[in-house]
Structure formats: C-alpha cells, structure tokens
Amino acid sequence: MTLQPQMEEQLIETDKTIEEYKVDEPEDIFEKDDEKVAIILKDYYASAAPFMFHYFPDNFEEIAQDYSKIFWDFLSSDAIKKSVFDLHVQIHQNKYDVRGKMKNKSIKMYGIEDLSKEEFLAVAIHEFAHFVDIYYFQKKVIRDLSENFYGISWESTKVMQAGLKQSDFVSWYAMTNKYEDFAESFTYYVLHNKDFLQKAEKSEILMKKYKYFWVYFFKKDDFKQQDFSIENEVLDYYRDITKIPFDIENLLQYLKKWI
C-alpha cells in the first residue's frame, strides 16, 4: 500500500477481474444462511497449504528474521491460519514506491529496515487482508463473500453509495476504493478492535463492516473487544490505519495463545 495522495486513482495490483456484481443489500448480509456459508468456507480451508517466506537478496534473511518472525506468528495463529493457503511472503531489503503490495498470492514487503516492527506488521496485515479478500473469499468457492462487504458502501470499485460520510469509513485510505476499504477495515479490526467498535456505535455503516468480519472471518471472540492501541484517545479521523501506534508485544502475547 502507499500513502501518496495520487494513489487515490490507483487500485490494488491484483489478477481479480473487476466487474459489476449484483450484491446483497447490506441489511441482509447477516442472515442465517450467510453465516452457514461462512462456516462452510472456514471448514473448506481448514487443511490449507502453508505459507513460505523468501528474501531478496538471499543474504538478507538473517537481518530480516526479527521482522519475518512477527508476521510468521501472526499467520500461524489459529485465528488466521485457517485462511492461509499457498501464500508467499517476499521480504525485500530495497525500497520501492510502496511499503507493501499483494499480487498473485504473494505479499511483498519493501525497505523493511526503514520501518519499525510495528509499522512492518501493520502493513503486512493490511496486505494479508487483500489476500483474504481476493483469494480466501474468492468467487469460485461457493460465492464471493467480499461482495457482501463491498455492498455496504460501494456502488462500484471507486464509486461510493450516496449519502455516505467520512465517519462511515475507518480511514481516508479506506475511502479510495472498495478493496482498500476492506483491507483498512480488516487491519482496524485486528489491531484496534475496541476502537473500531466504539466508532461503529455511532455509525450504522461502520457497525455493518465490524459485524461483517465478526460473522464471516473471525470466530466470535477472536480479537473482539481487544485493543492494542498505545494511545487511549479514539480520534475522529485517521489517514492510514497502519500508522496508528500499537503495542506489538501485547499483540504477540495475545497471538501466542493460539500458536
């Protein structure tokens, strides 16, 4: 992902075909049948293939291990590993014009020596959310559950539904297109769940997004009411969820109970 304003006009690099779908009305997305679909989907991937890490250049592995280990722990936790299959994580020493991106089942992280471990993990989780969106919820498996999320706020890829406000999105970056809305909301749910829920109590749209991840992806108590934020104040506006400070040690301790 990137923080540059000009990226408003760019979409996530992905091989997913962009097309118009007939989506469920938002108020219908939490019906009993949909919850059964989510359970079936979780079972379908229960024995999914693992993930692999790759380093560029090859001799960068030793230097990067402290970074890759924290993302490894995240992917290995019971809350997450059910959705991981055939995933490749590339750790690059060199910088690029973005900190991370996801394409073709590969998450690529760039210039990590210039990132704190907290920012590295937040960006990696954001990119993993794109993997969940594009591949775990892929259309050919039962049906594309991502469309239920898009239908909450979006008419098409970059066209919002009428009447929506800034407060109906978790960040400025989430407002750029439906894919970034999904990834930013996923990251917010994992790292700042209590914060997310507090805001959702003031926005029906945000509450639907919060409940979407609660119903379709996470078990009922995974991350719920957890908050790894360092600052207690809940801000009205965030530009980028990956820039919000959080306590990485508390997060890793929370994940370890599932590893």
Model segments located where?
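N-terminal low-structure segments adjacent to metalloprotease catalytic domains
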Residues: M1-E62, Y188, K211, F217, ...
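Auxiliary, metal-adjacent structural segments of Zn-dependent hydrolase domains
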Residues: I39-I107
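Active-site-flanking segments in enzyme catalytic domains
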Residues: I80-I259
